[in-house]
């Protein structure tokens, strides 16, 4: 017993290599700002993919301004119910098989219906109580949803189905809402509104980019996702420029500071060769933690509040940065990979990806730290 206590004591205070610091006050600020910008809509907070990498349970618990939650998978919905969430939950991809339907009934989970197979499963099921259904319309993205020419037949069958709670609800999804000059979005809005005009059920069209850029798409419900976490859906503006606060700050620290001479290379493949005598910092984070291996030389990192470029290929557990010849940084000093002072959007742009991918790909090696 004494040995066990000693072992636990020795591991309680060790320094984690990488930590994602989640600012729950920033989350609540962002939700309030969404409500101000879509004052006539109810808010369905999208918390799929572990709350966009921020922690499903913590996000749901502190998203007090949300009227409902949207998830992609049934297991995400069940996690929410297990941690005490009683607000409505919608399966945005719908159920995958007829065997899922009793689980939806038991746990009061709403579902999207987007295809003939789901409709047939609903018609053939024997359920204790009806399920709230959102009919997904393919208004132009051509990923999920019933085509406009199928719409009326689906509506009639869903209205006749005793397993469907009335009134039926309606939704669609934009393909290019983040591109202000793209003609596709106005066409999608026009088509969706024309199909659902006069319907009794509630409707939802706008996700993050839609609710921010296309006010006419703010219907009875909006579905904020990435913007809720303080990350912009737009390629030309950060969330901070839109008034939102980044919720996640990804941190690590220097584990070595090394002198590198002009002409010497650093890292696997010798992809970076120093042009001058300099100091290189080694940071304890890599692709094993979810930081992209594809990050090229020059990708910015903050060390002691100053931007420095990645120098050399990202490895599994480490990455290296050029601190400069006059650097005074030391082992143990803080490094920020993205956060309030280094937007994830900027980092993603250097890497050639989107910030959505950065925040959702962190692995279990990264410590999650929450402040409220």
UniProtKB/Swiss-Prot annotation:
It holds the Pfam family Ala_racemase_C. Its cofactor is pyridoxal 5'-phosphate. The keyword Isomerase applies. SUPFAM superfamilies: Alanine racemase C-terminal domain-like, PLP-binding barrel. InterPro entries: Ala_racemase (IPR000821), Ala_racemase/Decarboxylase_C (IPR009006), Ala_racemase_C (IPR011079), Ala_racemase_N (IPR001608), Ala_racemase_pyridoxalP-BS (IPR020622), PLP-binding_barrel (IPR029066). Signal peptide: none annotated. The modification N6-(pyridoxal phosphate)lysine is found at residue 48. Pathway: Amino-acid biosynthesis; D-alanine biosynthesis; D-alanine from L-alanine: step 1/1. Keywords: Isomerase, Pyridoxal phosphate. Belongs to the alanine racemase family. Catalyzes the interconversion of L-alanine and D-alanine. May also act on other amino acids. This is Alanine racemase. It comes from Vibrio vulnificus (strain YJ016). The gene is alr.
């Amino acid at each position: 017993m004494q040995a066990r206590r000693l072992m636990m004591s020795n591991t309680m205070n060790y320094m984690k290599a990488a930590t994602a610091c989640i600012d729950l006050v920033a989350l609540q600020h962002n939700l309030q700002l969404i409500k101000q910008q879509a004052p006539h809509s109810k808010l369905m907070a999208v918390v799929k993919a572990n709350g966009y990498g921020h922690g499903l349970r913590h996000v749901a618990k502190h998203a007090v301004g949300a009227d409902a939650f949207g998830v992609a998978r049934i297991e995400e919905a069940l996690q929410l119910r297990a941690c005490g969430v009683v607000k409505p939950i919608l399966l945005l991809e719908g159920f995958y098989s007829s065997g899922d339907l009793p689980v939806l009934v038991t746990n009061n989970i709403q579902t999207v219906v987007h295809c003939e197979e789901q409709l047939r499963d609903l018609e053939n099921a024997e359920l204790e109580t009806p399920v709230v259904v959102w009919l997904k319309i393919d208004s132009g993205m051509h990923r999920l949803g019933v085509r406009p020419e199928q719409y009326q037949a689906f509506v009639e069958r869903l209205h006749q189905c005793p397993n469907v709670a009335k009134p039926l609800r309606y939704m669609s999804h934009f393909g290019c809402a983040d591109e202000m000059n793209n003609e596709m979005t106005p066409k999608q809005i026009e088509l969706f509104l024309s199909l659902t005009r006069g319907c009794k059920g509630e409707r939802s069209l706008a996700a993050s980019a839609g609710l921010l850029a296309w006010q006419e798409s703010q219907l009875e419900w909006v579905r904020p996702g990435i913007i809720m976490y303080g990350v912009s859906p737009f390629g030309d503006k950060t969330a901070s420029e839109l008034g939102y606060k980044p919720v996640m700050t990804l941190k690590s620290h220097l584990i070595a500071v090394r002198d590198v001479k002009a002409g010497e290379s650093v890292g696997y493949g010798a992809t970076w060769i120093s042009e001058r005598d300099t100091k290189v910092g080694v940071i304890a984070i890599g692709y094993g933690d979810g930081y992209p291996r594809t990050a090229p030389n020059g990708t910015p990192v903050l060390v002691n509040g100053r931007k420095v470029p990645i120098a050399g290929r990202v490895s599994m557990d480490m990455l290296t940065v050029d601190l400069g010849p006059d650097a005074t940084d030391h082992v143990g000093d803080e490094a920020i990979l993205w956060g309030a002072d280094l937007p994830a959007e900027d980092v993603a742009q250097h890497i050639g990806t989107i910030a959505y991918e950065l925040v959702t790909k962190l692995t279990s090696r990264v410590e999650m730290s929450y402040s409220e």
